[in-house]
Swiss-Prot record:
Glycans are attached at residues 68, 293. Mn(2+) binds at residue 188. It is a single-pass type II membrane protein. Homodimer. The chain crosses the membrane at residues 3-23. Pfam families: Glyco_transf_43. Involved in the biosynthesis of L2/HNK-1 carbohydrate epitope on both glycolipids and glycoproteins. Substrates include asialo-orosomucoid (ASOR), paragloboside (lacto-N-neotetraosylceramide), Gal-beta-1,4-GlcNAc-beta-1,3-Gal-beta-1,4-Glc-pyridylamine and Gal-beta-1,3-GlcNAc-beta-1,3-Gal-beta-1,4-Glc-pyridylamine. This is Galactosylgalactosylxylosylprotein 3-beta-glucuronosyltransferase 2. GO terms for molecular function: galactosylgalactosylxylosylprotein 3-beta-glucuronosyltransferase activity; metal ion binding. The gene is B3gat2. Keywords: Glycoprotein, Golgi apparatus, Manganese, Membrane, Metal-binding, Signal-anchor, Transferase, Transmembrane, Transmembrane helix. Its main location: Golgi. It comes from Rattus norvegicus (Rat). It comes from the Eukaryota.
Length: 324
């Protein structure tokens, strides 16, 4: 009896399963899409059961994000104050050599603009070609020194320095002045790169020692408690500013705020050009000592030796005209 019931049950079981499956199928539900990619939900469960979008990742992007997370976020660097170097120059056998040495130094200084002023009525081909190849931001000016001022005992380069000052003021006349520093870079000086780092932080007028000047190994401002209190110099200690032209820098804002400050011809005694200029824009108490409280020499008034051209032929010249 039991055997007969079991046989009937097993015969009916497949039909019962078929009926259950047919009842469970909803003909209105679309069939699932077949895909070669593994299926995953585009959301993940967040706090409180909320569904949060799940971002897909790629190996390249994950690696870049890891690098960015480990790298500190750098703030944009403030713009360096521009250093304006005014260089008077005049024609002579060593002119190109002097300018080459100076350009090799300036080329290593960031954010420097070279204002080269020739002592002549027109621009020379030598200086124009030189500046075109110098690889430096530059301005080429020219102004001749009046004949009556070309005396050995009179100050030189007065008109040229004033031309550089006039160009700066005109350039910034109708625009807000960017941070900048001005200094007078004669072409017969030698400069340490450290000097440019020192002068770039000038707030008003900064000063430092100068080597090989005034008949001494160096001249310098005397400093006490961070203030200039006197001058170590070999000539006229009574000068208001007993300093060489290579021994100071001036903020661009000070130059623009004092439009009448220039180098004077009339009423200026020999050797007093620096003092007469600085008196118009500052006082000794306001000077900012640089170069470790004026105890380091970072600029030298080297002066190229006067060349001996006694053997230069007057006749039977070389057939090739070489620029020197």
């Amino acid at each position: 009896m039991k055997s007969a019931l079991c046989n009937r049950f097993f015969i009916l079981l497949p039909w019962i399963l078929i009926v259950i499956i047919m009842l469970d199928v909803d003909p209105r539900r679309p069939a699932p899409q077949l895909t070669s990619r593994p299926y995953f939900s585009p959301h993940t469960v967040g706090c409180g059961g909320s569904r949060v979008p799940l971002r897909r990742s790629s190996p390249g992007r994950d690696a870049a994000e890891k690098r960015n997370e480990s790298r500190p976020q750098l703030q944009p660097e403030p713009r360096l104050p521009t250093i304006y170097a005014i260089t008077p120059t005049y024609s002579r056998p060593v002119q190109k050599a002097e300018l080459t040495r100076l350009a090799n130094t300036f080329r290593q200084v960031a954010q420097l603009h070279w204002i080269l002023v020739e002592d002549r009525a027109t621009r020379s081909e030598l200086v124009s070609s030189f500046l075109a190849r110098a690889g430096l931001p530059n301005t080429h000016l020219h102004v001749p020194t009046p004949r009556r001022y070309k005396r050995p005992w009179l100050p030189r380069a007065t008109e040229q320095r004033n031309a550089g000052l006039a160009w700066l003021r005109q350039r910034h006349q109708h625009q807000s002045a960017q941070p900048g520093v001005l200094f007078f870079a004669d072409d017969d000086n030698t400069y340490s790169l450290e000097l440019f780092q020192e002068m770039r932080t000038t707030r008003k007028v900064s000063v430092w020692p100068v080597g090989l000047v005034g008949g001494r190994r160096y001249e310098r401002p005397l400093v006490k408690n961070g203030k200039v209190v006197g001058w170590y110099t070999g000539w006229r200690e009574d000068r208001p500013f007993a300093i060489d032209m290579a021994g100071f820098a001036v903020s661009l804002q000070v130059i623009l705020s004092n439009p009448k400050a220039v180098f004077k011809r009339r009423g200026s005694q020999p050797g007093m050009q620096e003092s007469d200029f600085l008196k118009q824009i500052t006082t000794v108490d306001e000077l900012e000592p640089k170069a470790n409280n004026c105890t380091k020499v970072l600029v030298w008034h080297t002066r190229t030796e006067k060349v001996n051209l006694a053997n230069e032929p007057k006749y039977h010249m070389d057939t090739v005209n070489i620029e020197v």
